[in-house]
Amino acid sequence: MVKAIKVMLIPNNVQKTKMFQYAGASRFAYNWALAREKESYEKGGKFISDSELRKEFTKLRHSDEYAWLLNISNNVTKQAIKDACTAYKNFFKDLQKFPRFKSRKRSMPKFYQDNVKIQFSNTHVKLEGFSSSRKANKQKKNWVRLAEHGRIPTDVKYMNPRISFDGLNW
């Protein structure tokens, strides 16, 4: 059985900044993939698969103009591109309207975390890419505090973990 659990995180200021950077990179990757798909369709081309778009995006990440993307986990941008391709496919299957570009004002800041690399304890969660030190005494600083202790079960498999900002809390 698949069950959704939504919990509130209490990040410090450095972690909040990192989360907003991840959400911005996710929005950028989604918009970039949607623009590439739209451009290809207008030129009469076929649908570009998400694997091809991810390869192009990897080359884009390593260019000097987009060097800021190298500080972001690749799983965040990879899933955003997959989401854009899924939304585009659903439009052509008449399941949804045409996907809209995400804006800073209108869209909810959110991003994906890899379910293999995310770790949970009773009181904290460790997100991918937040570790800044390998020293044992500073490892706990990389963990984000949970508002509700013991809410997340630790002995289950996690599917598609997403982190979103609702305007007040993560």
Language model features with spans:
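Nucleic-acid substrate recognition interfaces
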Residues: 1-170
